[in-house]
Curated annotation (Swiss-Prot):
Pfam families: Mur_ligase_C, Mur_ligase_M, MurD-like_N. GO terms for biological process: cell division; cell wall organization; peptidoglycan biosynthetic process; regulation of cell shape. Belongs to the MurCDEF family. It is found in: Cytoplasm. The lineage of its organism: Bacteria, Bacillati, Cyanobacteriota, Cyanophyceae, Gomontiellales. This is UDP-N-acetylmuramoylalanine--D-glutamate ligase. The keyword Mitochondrion does not apply. ATP binds at residues 114-120. Cell wall formation. Catalyzes the addition of glutamate to the nucleotide precursor UDP-N-acetylmuramoyl-L-alanine (UMA). It catalyses: UDP-N-acetyl-alpha-D-muramoyl-L-alanine + D-glutamate + ATP = UDP-N-acetyl-alpha-D-muramoyl-L-alanyl-D-glutamate + ADP + phosphate + H(+). GO terms for cellular component: cytoplasm. The keyword Metal-binding does not apply.
Amino acid sequence: MPHAHIIGLGQSGIAAARLLRREGWQVTISDRNSTPTLVEQQQRLDQEGIDVLLAHNFELDRDSHPPDLVVVSPGVPWQGAGLVQARAAGIETIGEIELAWRHLQQFPWVGITGTNGKTTTTALVAAMFQTAGLKAIACGNIGYSVCDLVLSEQAIDWVIAEISSYQLESLPRLAPKIAVWTTFTPDHLERHGTLECYRETKAVLLQQAEYKVLNGDDPYLRQELSDRWPEVWWTSCNGRAALPHGIERGIYLEEGWVKVQEQPIVPVSSWKMPGHHNLQNLLLAVAVAHLGGIPVAAIAEAVNNFGGVPHRLEPICTWSGIQFINDSKATNYDAAETGLVAVPAPVILIAGGQAKQGDDRRWLEMIQTKAAAVLLIGAAANLFAQRLQEVGYDRYEIVETMANAVPRAAELAKKYSANIVLLSPACASFDQYKSFEQRGDDFRQLCLSRFAK
């Protein structure tokens, strides 16, 4: 019986383990952590015939019988010692999405990557295809693992996959019908090392795609990739003149309409999502739908009905004229700057968490322009306070926790006549939460319990 070792006891790792076990593999799944939740999962998986090792770092010399296959969860660094050993020993080492691709490659895929904008674009593309009557499943980094989709055995017409750079590291063979690159700014450099390595990791998805769609309003993509793939479809919110290679393969805004080549598809007035960045997401999704053969009527209906996704400029409630907005997905400076741009000033900003590498200058400039006050939480609070001081901004407070931040934000909104309280952290969440979703859920619950009575 062939033996597979799965690294990472998260949703994708568990789905991969169950899929391989169903196919007759001997399966071991390991995780470097050991928590009460993981122990409960260990007990459940043991009943399914899956061995679970907790507080375990995968290394070949620790295993008397090396596995035939290693499957890596997204959170596991591709250059970790155990994985380097496995690849050097000739052991096939892949990611969960690669495993799923081997079972679903008979279906057309849309693969969506980028620093920011992935989730909204993925959800909107899926909505357009579903409105046309197709069984199009949003999966991947959006929260539903692709191996779970395989296990579900449901009918499929299209796979709509959000794919992060972490997942692309271990995804050598994926060849989507349509690939989308939403934006590119410095992020995850603690994982990828250099901007160039991060870029090339992203580029893998498009290299093997039949159709390639890029955001022509992203300065980095426009500068670095305008001549790399001549067959690219480009989008632009700035009209046909801004398309890198004209309208032959162009989707753009003109006269209040989203147009494909010269055909009006949907009026911008039907799009409810705030912010210029969401217009970019809209154009990318329309491009995918056009290439996927979706009728114009279905595209327009999906756009009109689309209400957004949680944790991306998500309106929570309004109290005394103050709107509370959850942008917990803003886990880097660029996304947090975009969140500030999307809402009217003055704003009470809640920021902080686990800091990332990156250029914070434009984010700080936007704080100076839009924020009446800033409340700092989490491990990055002192660092952010120092950076705000350095640019001459002094209306900040270190409040440490979300529970302290929400009521204080309401007080400051009254003081400064601000109509918006915005959680847009510019940080990862792992210092205080297990995910940005849990952080956003905490913010939502605190707002609703206090202000939605």
